[in-house]
Amino acid sequence: MTSALEKNRPSAAFAFDNSYAGLPQRFFAAQMPTQVAEPWLIKLNEPLAAELGLDVEALRRDGAAIFSGNLVPEGAQPLAMAYAGHQFGGFSPQLGDGRAILLGEVIDRSGRRFDIQLKGAGPTPFSRRGDGRAAIGPVLREYIISEAMFALGIPATRALAAVTTGEPVYREEVLPGAVFTRVATSHIRVGTFQYFAARGDTDGVRALTNYVIDRHYPALKEADNPYLALFEAVSERQAALIARWLHVGFIHGVMNTDNMTVSGETIDFGPCAFMDAYDPATVFSSIDQHGRYAYANQPGIGQWNLARLGETLLPLIDDEPDAAVDKANAVIRAYGERFQTHWLAGMREKIGLAREEDGDLELVQTLLSLMQAQGADFTLTFRRLSDLAGDEAAEPDFAASFREAEASRNWLSRWRERLSRDPQTAGARAAAMRKVNPAFIPRNHRVEQAIEAAVENGDFSLFEALLTVLARPYDDQPDFAPYREPPKPHERVLATFCGT
């Protein structure tokens, strides 16, 4: 084990500039990471480290110790954040970081502020009898999905590092322990607001809201009603984010209010998955037994979560309770239109339409219904349509997406007729479509294969290969063609699980 002397040895790898630690003490609990026996660095995201202005050489040297929590860098102020949350509709007034410790904040080369957080770094006052640890499988999953989302262009937390601890964790079975280092524009959630509101702590809600405006939405300080403007801005970001999820077939799996950031980033990738065959009722999360967070339910859940945020802001939005409710409800009602606008705009791009027409929604819905009826793979179908947009010879490949090759003929006829009124050339259209229709996603079976190889054999080669492929999701990458393919029947992943 790293000695206490080494733990306190200064490391200048980070230039911390901490602000959350300056909030009132009730916002968090100061908490040092718990040391581990034999940390080993699985992966350091060197490009991200450089972008964050970190000392990459120091991280190569000390990364195992730093990212395991054995060596706390100079300037860190480790803490566990307090928050509450609705979990599958039921309210828990105290959750908090039960296995995550925020080391501090850094300012990147563009002047943006980011949190550096260790997940699996040991118990905290919020652990609720848990061990505060993480197993290697969920750590690798979060690393893979975080970086895949970034490459897909979807706002999400990032992966800075993954380390093994040299210690077991005890779940349904004994598994190798690991720690994941997450980077986020902040870790403030809807549940953070709920924590203070549930205690009748309006001053706490106000302090948190002012902090969020300063950190994430500084332009709103000039608004006539900054608190209402914040609610509108968060609603807009969530509508745009969830639309992007649907555009790539992403299913979060655990959209509790403590897993919804006010920054508009996707966070917490425990039971998430990407859809193979298109079915709007798709659920992967083993704990979502009633389909609350199914693929097609995600927009509505986003609105429900926003309503919970709005409830916490009512005392700030207007001194008159009825007026506050009316103003908040107007924002909540507008969310549906915001989402639909973002979703339809993205779907137009996916089928190659540059100009809006009234019949576009019906054209999109007809294709989706056909895909569902024919068991078509979501990602492959749209990628093959991109190819067809630029080369009529690709029609057999597109038709092969469906169980019955003739099934797509009527829709293709309508699509071509619609394209005849669109201004783009075929080449420009195909190129634009390939930028929004990925060839590669983190196929669930590929993620599981990479995790299994690491857990069972200590083999990280599949993990590394998957990261390489997913870093360029919109490129064809013929050398990695098998990674495009959906799972064979025996490879299908039927359920995913929470872990980190």
From Swiss-Prot:
Residues annotated for ATP binding in this entry: G96, G98, R99, K119, D131, G132, R182, R189, D268
The EC designation for this entry is 2.7.7.-, 2.7.7.108
Q: Print the keywords alphabetically.
A: ATP-binding, Magnesium, Manganese, Metal-binding, Nucleotide-binding, Nucleotidyltransferase, Transferase
Is ATP-binding among this UniProt entry's keywords?
yes
Task: Kindly identify the residues recorded as the active site.
Answer: D258 (proton acceptor)
Q: Which residues form a coiled coil?
A: none
Question: Which cofactor does the UniProt annotation name?
Answer: Mg(2+); Mn(2+)
Instruction: State the reactions this protein catalyses.
Output: L-seryl-[protein] + ATP = 3-O-(5'-adenylyl)-L-seryl-[protein] + diphosphate; L-threonyl-[protein] + ATP = 3-O-(5'-adenylyl)-L-threonyl-[protein] + diphosphate; L-tyrosyl-[protein] + ATP = O-(5'-adenylyl)-L-tyrosyl-[protein] + diphosphate; L-histidyl-[protein] + UTP = N(tele)-(5'-uridylyl)-L-histidyl-[protein] + diphosphate
Binding positions (Mg(2+)) = N259, D268
The UniProt family comment states: Belongs to the SELO family.
- What is its biological role? Nucleotidyltransferase involved in the post-translational modification of proteins. It can catalyze the addition of adenosine monophosphate (AMP) or uridine monophosphate (UMP) to a protein, resulting in modifications known as AMPylation and UMPylation.
Q: What is this protein called?
A: Protein nucleotidyltransferase YdiU
- Organism name: Rhizobium etli (strain CIAT 652)
